[in-house]
Design a protein with these regions (language model features):
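Hydrophobic transmembrane alpha-helices and their immediate loop junctions
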Residues: 1-367
């Protein structure tokens, strides 16, 4: 599969508008909360001690005990999964570690701008909040916590005393380092359940009509620069197209070099099929879309889906054993159970360098 990068002009404009709004927010924070705000135009950070009391209360609850046990169990499992997905991506030439950049299309997959930005912020918020809960559970304190932005992306952070964490026994260290990823996995599964629930509600009440959109055309094909971007595909050779798999069904009855008639919202197009892997290929990148009868329901459905994807992606990706990611810190604590600190540090550093090089190689598949 091709993973050509693509971003539309409208998405570029939307990203710039969001970036401008975030800048305005941080300018006001810099004016009224100067001592808590660091603002550098493309980067900003705001520290606060609000909500820390809530973290403390939760740290004394049964939920924190459950989260603590779950983190200890999931930590090593997520490290294993993170490494597995990296090697799986390399072996299959799939960019499993491609960055979640809003508005970017990786082949047929487009990350919606608003939903992606919201999902990244929520995933980062609950991730860091969970770290804070287990820090307090171990009777340690936080210097502060807050949120930041880098370009159009927003996230959250907590500032524990790392030296105090290193004084804890290795089991407690593993719990603290793994808990952010653990809560992301839990949240991701909850959002997945809500997503499928929304699909069920939409289907039983017939709240949406399916259709297929042509996002853009690919170079070295006869469709390139012939069919406009963001065109609705109605039919191929008279066969109605409502779902993506129907396109493949029609193409199975054709051969490379044959002409097909595409009926679209931009008019009729007689396109010659090219040969790709000995199969007929139109040269269009399509996306499944729905015409929703209730305003806003499509946004909610999309948001729930991307909340699932981003949370699970952050939960697994952050546990790749590369220092100073949580996975690297967790791996170091695990190694120190069996080895001395110097040996653990050397192994962790060596592993980090190797895995970082492999991740960069994996990401290169999108170029």
């Amino acid at each position: 599969m091709s993973y050509n990068l693509y971003i539309s002009n409208s998405n570029v404009l939307s990203i710039l508008i969001i970036f401008l709004v975030i800048n305005i927010i941080f300018i006001f924070l810099k004016i009224f909360k100067k001592e808590n705000t660091d603002y550098k135009f493309i980067y900003g950070m705001f520290r606060t001690k609000k909500l820390m009391e809530i973290m403390k209360k939760i740290s004394n609850s049964k939920f924190s005990k459950f989260l603590s046990i779950l983190s200890l169990i999931l930590g090593p499992i997520l490290i294993t999964l993170a490494v597995f997905f990296l090697f799986f991506g390399i072996l299959t030439r799939t960019p499993t570690y491609a960055p979640a950049l809003p508005g970017i299309s990786y082949g047929p997959i487009t990350l919606p701008i608003t939903q992606t930005i919201i999902s990244i912020f929520i995933a980062a918020f609950i991730h860091e909040f969970a770290h804070g809960i287990l820090v307090y559970k171990n009777n340690l304190d936080l210097k502060s916590w807050g949120f930041f932005y880098l370009g159009p992306l927003m996230g959250a952070f907590v500032e524990p005393d790392e030296k105090e964490i290193e004084k804890l026994n290795k089991k407690e260290q593993i719990k603290i380092y793994s808990t952010g990823a653990a809560i992301n996995i839990i949240a991701g599964l909850i959002f997945l359940f809500l997503f499928f629930s929304s699909l069920y509600i939409i289907s039983i009440f017939n709240l949406a009509t399916p259709y297929v959109k042509i996002l853009y055309t690919l170079p070295n094909t006869y469709a390139y620069n012939v069919i406009p971007n963001n065109t609705i595909l109605y039919s191929i050779n008279g066969n109605q197209i409502l779902y993506l798999n129907q396109i493949e069904g029609v193409l199975n009855n054709t051969k490379p070099g044959e002409y097909i008639l595409l009926n679209t919202s931009a008019g009729l197009f007689n396109i010659e099929l090219t040969n790709k892997d000995n199969k007929p290929f139109i040269g269009i990148v399509t996306e499944q879309e729905y015409d929703y009868k209730v305003p806003g329901i499509d946004f909610i459905e999309s948001l729930l889906f991307w909340l699932f994807v981003i949370n699970v992606g952050l939960g697994i990706g952050n546990m790749i054993p590369i220092y100073p990611l949580d996975g690297g810190k967790t791996m170091k604590s695990i190694l120190e159970i069996f080895l001395d600190k110097k040996e653990s540090r050397i192994i962790t550093l060596s592993l980090s360098i190797i895995l970082l090089a492999l991740i960069l190689y994996n990401i290169s598949f999108i170029l």
